């Protein structure tokens, strides 16, 4: 679906509108302001003012604004070149981050399990911004050369491994214009939640976690307006950007027709016991690395069981949303058998090896 991202206003006019009559700002205005920044037409004051005003005026809670900013960002993305024969469904599981819980890297691990179970996964991610260890940090620490992955070899990685990691900084180089200012400002802005909206592959189906329940229907509506179908937006009742292992999770599910269905799920739906979130907390990069290796090697310690079950419910739901599993319980069981089989370790090791080979070939 094409979203109009063109406005006749200048950046100065857009900033004035945000400051004085924000109710008159259109999605096209927001996208045009972002384009001016990406094109290098904004000075430091205008850049900081634009980002700050979007946040203070609540534009991050408007689905039309999020969709317009995402569409403009995608216009400048490096788009992977998939092979004509690659018509199979591509999926993702991703969260906004920023929930404050600092849990283990669940979506990263779940994406690997889902790929080993038979789905084709294009995982979009970045370095840590609000936790101790982001998806890119963890994968790199275990031998993946993520900088070697570019638009020209995504198709090959998917063909070989059914898994690829799309490093946001590689595929969205235009975002470098905002990165330093966002860090220096030090508060959340609408750009903090754009990640799930701007996977350059534009997956066919996905599970998207959000850090607060009010953002759930907003994200679902933004995804729908971008043409996404069979996407599920989730938020644990603790304001967790994943499916909770501790209790209930709210789901906003966009079906084939674009209808958004809101319902609640629980670990009981997956045949998995509940655990306190504290039992699934992330730690340092080194600790998370060791935990992932134990999961892949099927050499769990008793303290790993909660994290294992956390992975099962999130992977199981992705398998359910993607149609591989008829029920959530079946999805969790497929995930468990896949993890125990050693297939996930084999996939990860071969994927990491391929990334290093790409680096050698292009270095």
Where are these regions (language model features)?
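N-terminal glycine-rich anion-binding loops that anchor highly charged ligand groups
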Residues: 3-10, 16-66, 74-82, 310
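Active-site cofactor/substrate anionic-group-binding motifs, chiefly glycine-
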Residues: 58-129
């Amino acid at each position: 679906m094409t979203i109009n991202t063109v406005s006749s206003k200048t950046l100065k006019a857009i900033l004035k509108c945000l400051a004085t009559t924000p109710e008159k700002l259109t999605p096209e205005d927001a996208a045009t302001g972002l384009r001016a920044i990406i094109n290098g037409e904004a000075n430091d004051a205008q850049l900081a003012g634009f980002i700050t005003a979007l946040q203070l005026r609540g534009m991050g809670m408007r689905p039309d604004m999020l969709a317009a900013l995402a569409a403009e960002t995608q216009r400048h993305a490096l788009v992977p070149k998939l092979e004509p024969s690659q018509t199979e469904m591509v999926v993702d599981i991703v969260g906004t981050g920023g929930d404050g819980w600092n849990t283990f890297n669940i979506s990263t691990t779940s994406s690997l399990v889902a790929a080993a179970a038979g789905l084709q996964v294009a995982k979009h991610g970045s370095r840590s911004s609000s936790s101790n260890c982001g998806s890119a940090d963890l994968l790199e620490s275990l031998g993946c050369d993520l900088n070697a992955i570019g638009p020209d070899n995504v198709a090959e990685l998917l063909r070989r491994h059914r898994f690829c990691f799309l490093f946001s900084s590689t595929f969205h180089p235009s975002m470098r214009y905002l990165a330093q200012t966002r860090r220096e400002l030090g508060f959340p802005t609408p750009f903090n939640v754009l990640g799930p909206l701007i996977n350059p592959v534009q997956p066919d189906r996905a599970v998207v976690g959000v850090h607060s329940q009010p953002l759930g229907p907003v994200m679902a509506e933004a995804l729908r307006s971008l043409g996404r179908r069979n996407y599920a937006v989730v938020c644990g009742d603790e304001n967790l950007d994943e499916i909770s292992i501790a209790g209930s999770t709210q789901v906003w599910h966009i079906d084939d027709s674009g209808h958004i269905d809101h319902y609640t799920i629980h670990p009981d739906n997956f045949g998995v016991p509940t655990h306190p979130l504290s039992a699934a907390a992330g730690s340092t990069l080194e600790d998370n690395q060791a935990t992932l290796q134990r999961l892949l090697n099927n050499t769990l310690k008793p303290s790993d069981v909660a994290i294992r079950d956390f992975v099962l419910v999130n992977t199981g739901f992705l398998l359910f949303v993607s149609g591989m599993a008829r029920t959530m319980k079946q999805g969790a069981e497929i995930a468990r058998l896949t993890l125990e089989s050693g297939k996930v370790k084999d996939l990860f090791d071969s994927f990491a090896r391929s990334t290093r080979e790409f680096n050698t070939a292009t270095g």
